[in-house]
Amino acid sequence: MALNLEKKQEIIKAFATKANDTGSCEVQVALLNERIKLLTEHLKTNPKDHSSRLGLLKLVAQRRNLLKYIKRTDHVRYVVLIEKLGIKDR
């Protein structure tokens, strides 16, 4: 499941730390979070789509690793990000 360009630009603008910032951890986590939401909805309607389920698991692992990195380097940034995204703290 791909994000459309407008939605992607909106997410980048909301989570960018400076102008033209597309690669910061916050932006990456926000984009992954949106893709995870889309795939979750897809899997609710198509429960036998195993390749999408594996892709979802990979995206969740990637998001978890990025969040772990942010938590380790700057805890305040981590707390703000998970509150903005509505992700539970583990």
Swiss-Prot record:
<dbReference type="InterPro" id="IPR005290">
    <property type="entry name" value="Ribosomal_uS15_bac-type"/>
</dbReference>
<dbReference type="Pfam" id="PF00312">
    <property type="entry name" value="Ribosomal_S15"/>
</dbReference>
<keyword id="KW-0687">Ribonucleoprotein</keyword>
<comment type="similarity">
    <text>Belongs to the universal ribosomal protein uS15 family.</text>
</comment>
<dbReference type="GO" id="GO:0019843">
    <property type="term" value="F:rRNA binding"/>
</dbReference>
<comment type="function">
    <text>One of the primary rRNA binding proteins, it binds directly to 16S rRNA where it helps nucleate assembly of the platform of the 30S subunit by binding and bridging several RNA helices of the 16S rRNA.</text>
</comment>
<protein>
    <recommendedName>
        <fullName>Small ribosomal subunit protein uS15</fullName>
    </recommendedName>
</protein>
<keyword id="KW-0694">RNA-binding</keyword>
<dbReference type="InterPro" id="IPR000589">
    <property type="entry name" value="Ribosomal_uS15"/>
</dbReference>
<dbReference type="GO" id="GO:0003735">
    <property type="term" value="F:structural constituent of ribosome"/>
</dbReference>
<dbReference type="GO" id="GO:0022627">
    <property type="term" value="C:cytosolic small ribosomal subunit"/>
</dbReference>
<keyword id="KW-0689">Ribosomal protein</keyword>
<comment type="function">
    <text>Forms an intersubunit bridge (bridge B4) with the 23S rRNA of the 50S subunit in the ribosome.</text>
</comment>
<comment type="subunit">
    <text>Part of the 30S ribosomal subunit. Forms a bridge to the 50S subunit in the 70S ribosome, contacting the 23S rRNA.</text>
</comment>
<dbReference type="InterPro" id="IPR009068">
    <property type="entry name" value="uS15_NS1_RNA-bd_sf"/>
</dbReference>
<dbReference type="GO" id="GO:0006412">
    <property type="term" value="P:translation"/>
</dbReference>
<keyword id="KW-0699">rRNA-binding</keyword>
